[in-house]
Amino acid sequence: MNAAALEAEDPSRAGQSPLRWWILAGVWLIYMCFGLTASSLAPLVAPIIRDLGLTHTEMGSVLGAWQLAFIVSAIPCGMLVDRLRPRRALLVGAFLIALSGVARSFATDYFTLFLAAALFGVGGPIVSTGAPKVVSQWFTGNERGLAMGIYISGPFAGGVVTLVTTNAVMMPLFEQNWRAVLLAWAGLAALSGLIWLVVSSRPEARQKEANLASATKVPTTTEIATLLRLRPVQILLVMAVCIFMINHGFSNWLPEILRSGRMDAVTAGYYAAFPTIVAVIGSIVIPRYAVPARRVMMLALLATSAGAGTLLLFIDTGPLLVLGLFLQGVSRGAMMTLAMLLLIELPAVGDKRVGTASGLFFAFAEVGGVGGPLTLGLLYDLTHSFTAGLLMLAGFAAIILVCLWALRPYLKAPPTASLEHR
């Protein structure tokens, strides 16, 4: 069945179904709980280190544990999404995220906390690879960029909730019991799965998924190898590592970086939430204007913003610190979105390989997701300062600029002329 036949049989494929916005809202809610759970440990670093007797290096490895599991599971989960279909897959992902939150709340030492955090790395990639597949199914043309920006704002919104409310609201509410706070976040994740079940069970959604499943082929390991041989895919995967190195290193340690400048925990939480709020807005607004002809230029500006924002964190207080946090928020909110758009719109990817291509993207990206938090923690233990870690993150922003320079010829060339690795 070709695309034209699908549109004739399924009007929502042409972007005409009102249900697509409810579907997008359901995806956003799950992805918001993804971000909420991913960032839930960062504001609780101090009490967790104290109660469980951890070093900063051990805590850094815990913060990177789920990304480590993500690396191993992202590609299989991407293939699972293509095989199982995203409606069911996202439900499974939501409940695995909730289970990780519950397990964290019962951790008794470094090992159990590490395993609980790593469990998130099994549910997380199902959501990360399933979400772009849902968007590619329900949205086309200019709406696709908007929809991508909206759903990717979800994790940042979840980060805002945890950073703003953990020490200011939740910890006092639960009598400074960090375990109860983590359990509450797990309950929200489970609720998001139930809401998705209701929204995605509509007959129209079931029919659309059945139509698309009959028209697409389940990817194989051979197709993964084919994607990995494409030069633009290789470049984008290197960029993914750098983007996540910056995003995860920055977001996981930002409250502690600010506290090292003599801020109290509540004030640091408010300051740390500021770039996340900016990221929510940026992830929605910027992709709307990132038409294909502008994407490389806009990504270059965002990488420059990330590097400059990181360097400005050397200033403890004042307007320049706020500017640095703002620049970090702008870049964090949109870099991944634009890189994902470049990847899934490559001719060699197409709708049938979105899940697998997304799995590849996140499998490589989470190398940076692990390396960022772990390396910052290690460098702090070695130097008793975050200076070396911040300089490292600025260096990865520079690498993104080099990758964009290398990517440009392949985006300008005809699809069949220069995609293959030569």
Model feature map: region roles:
Residues 293-342:
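C-terminal transmembrane helical hairpin of 12-TM major facilitator-type secondary transporters
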